[in-house]
């Protein structure tokens, strides 16, 4: 089993949870759940990079992904540490598609060894995040 907290410095983890609570109407429990899901997603995207899986998180988890990306220093350092010195690009698509990619991505994360908070992912199964098809990004 993989644990998202093992991939993020405790101080950075606490900071991202605080940023989520500052910017959104989330309590600490919800902010922690979201950041857990975001880290699981990002690490899986790194692990599966180049495989053409077209991973895409839903809008709910994407809130925490964007919060981390906007904390650029910490996101850059995380990419550097876990992606062999490279930077995991985020290239959102303009239009949303509804192709089942959110559900597929949650299963890829589970298959990669992370515990999936299915309720967070299921909320967006009928939707799609704005990830570019056929890109090596997230």
Language-model features: where?
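Intrinsically disordered, low-complexity, repeat-rich regions
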Residues: 1-138
């Amino acid at each position: 089993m993989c644990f998202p907290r093992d991939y993020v410095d405790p101080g950075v983890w606490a900071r991202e949870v605080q940023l989520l609570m500052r910017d959104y109407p989330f309590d600490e429990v919800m902010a922690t759940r979201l950041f857990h899901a975001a880290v699981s997603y990002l690490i899986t995207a790194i692990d599966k990079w180049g495989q053409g899986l077209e991973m895409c998180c839903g809008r709910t988890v994407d809130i925490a992904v964007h919060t981390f990306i906007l904390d650029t220093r910490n996101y850059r350092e995380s990419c550097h540490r876990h992606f062999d010195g490279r930077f995991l690009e985020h290239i959102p698509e303009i239009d949303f598609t509804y192709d089942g990619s959110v559900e597929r991505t949650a299963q890829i994360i589970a298959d990669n060894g992370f515990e999936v908070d299915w309720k967070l992912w299921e909320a967006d199964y009928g939707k799609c995040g704005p990830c570019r098809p056929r890109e090596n990004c997230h």
